[in-house]
């Protein structure tokens, strides 16, 4: 690893809560000093609804227009391999609470990178931390009203619906 490691942060924004994203960015910044690439993968609706968070944390939203099962995971995986080849990072951090990324993690490790995982405590399966070189689980601060990006999007849609008047 070089004196200042090159670090990529790739976020499955459909799978982790906004407060976990904030905690991860804060911790990684404290550990490495800089995160060279910060990207969040998710739906167009989530990108728009969370643009303030992404802007504040300097996270580039990567809009996934496909709607099929695991389409966000696939978009993240394809981009991750492109970035590993082009950017030659020392560390790749994947923020997701699911274990779908096992083949991706193995391939990135083969390219010589340390692969860290970040997830939400209570959502992470038993096997998920074993996939990564290192894995950190963050508490979901539900008391503050933090939710997953999908949940927050659903709430925003419901809030925009016309109110019903009761007699």
Which positions does each model-derived feature cover?
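Short acidic, S/G/P-rich loop/turn micro-motifs used as interaction or catalytic elements
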Residues: 14-18, 101, 143
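Structural recognition of alpha->loop->beta junctions
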Residues: 125-146
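N-terminal regulatory modules in eukaryotic regulatory proteins
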Residues: 147-167
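Short beta->alpha connector loops at strand-helix junctions that form conserved
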Residues: 63-65, 119, 138-140
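A glycine-rich beta-strand to alpha-helix segment
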Residues: 84-126
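Short, glycine/polar-rich helix-capping loops at beta-to-alpha or helix-loop-helix junctions
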Residues: 46-51, 120-128
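Short, well-ordered beta-strand core segments
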Residues: 61, 92, 135-136
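Domain-level signal for Mg2+-assisted phosphodiester chemistry and nucleotide/NA-binding surfaces
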Residues: 1-85, 109, 114
